[in-house]
């Protein structure tokens, strides 16, 4: 339904919930990928990228861009960089944590998730622009789900890569609130920013691309009001999401191992 809304040179690899969507951009002078999925699925990510490069008669992957550094969005970074020797772009606010590979600052300890260590080459600064494939994209700050998250906006075709700031039926867990930091107001401000943009298509971090932005914003705001009215709801929701995510990765575990993971996360 949305394929015709994508201009030439953009392909969406819709994944699932364990791995974020990957957006493949290709043009004469640049081939880029936005987000790399979770490490447990890195072979699939490599196969998808290799297949797209072959299908379109390309020879390289030049850039790997991360909207944020939750492990479902950057878990394939190390593998992609090793195979394709691409340059890695991360949100500017995460630079020190990546340079020093601080798994606590990168939230992997708190979230009980894994991410193979990787290096970066460049940073993404809100307000600046970056060429991905054939088109110029503007970097937009999108705090809330993650304080350092960014979105990417293509003005000519009115496309927003929203990551986990907006899905068709909501948004990602507001993690900062779980460790006593602000998040609800930041989500509201990010939704307000999205509303100011002329948008024909949103490519979310999870789920299919969608075009009814007004409906999705209304759904997201309703969800935000529900969570913000009782912060314990957000905490319970976050805990359930983290457990479901881990179970998706494990598939099968002894109950004691699950209980141990819960106790240590």
Predicted regions and their residues:
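Conserved beta-strand hairpin/beta-sheet module of binuclear metal-dependent hydrolase folds
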Residues: 2-56, 151-163, 168
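Short Pro/Gly-enriched beta-strand edge/turn motifs at strand-loop
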Residues: 4-10, 108-112, 133-135
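Divalent metal-coordination and catalytic microenvironments
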Residues: 9, 25, 35, 68, ...
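Hydrophobic/aromatic beta-strand patches that form the interior of the parallel beta-sheet core
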Residues: 11, 65, 89, 122-124, ...
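Metallo-beta-lactamase
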Residues: 31, 38-40, 136-143, 147-228
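Active-site HxH/HxHxD metal-binding segment of metal-dependent hydrolases
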Residues: 40-44, 49-131
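Accessory terminal helices/loops
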Residues: 195-201, 208-265
């Amino acid at each position: 339904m949305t394929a015709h809304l994508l201009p030439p040179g953009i392909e969406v690899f819709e994944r699932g919930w364990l791995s974020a969507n990957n957006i493949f951009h290709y043009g004469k002078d640049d081939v880029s990928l936005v987000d790399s999925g979770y490490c447990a699925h890195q072979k699939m990510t490599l196969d998808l990228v290799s297949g797209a490069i072959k299908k379109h008669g390309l020879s390289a992957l030049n850039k790997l861009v991360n909207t944020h550094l939750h492990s479902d969005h950057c878990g394939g970074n190390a593998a992609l960089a090793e195979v394709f020797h691409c340059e890695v772009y991360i949100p500017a606010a995460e630079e020190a944590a990546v340079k020093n590979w601080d798994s606590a600052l990168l939230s992997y300890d708190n979230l009980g998730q894994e991410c193979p260590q990787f290096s970066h080459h460049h940073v993404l600064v809100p307000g600046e622009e970056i060429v991905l494939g054939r088109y110029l994209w503007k970097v937009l700050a999108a705090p809330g789900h993650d304080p350092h998250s960014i979105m990417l906006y293509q003005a000519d075709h009115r496309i927003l890569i929203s990551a986990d700031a907006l899905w068709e039926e909501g948004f990602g867990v507001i993690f900062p609130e779980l460790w006593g930091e602000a998040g609800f107001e930041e989500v509201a401000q990010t939704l307000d920013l999205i509303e100011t943009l002329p948008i024909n298509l949103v490519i979310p971090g999870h789920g299919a691309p969608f075009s009814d932005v007004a409906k999705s914003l209304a759904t997201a705001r309703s969800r935000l009001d529900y969570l913000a009215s009782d912060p314990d709801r957000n905490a319970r929701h976050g805990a359930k999401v983290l457990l479901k995510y881990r179970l998706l990765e494990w598939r099968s575990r002894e109950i004691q191992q699950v209980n141990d993971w819960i106790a240590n996360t």
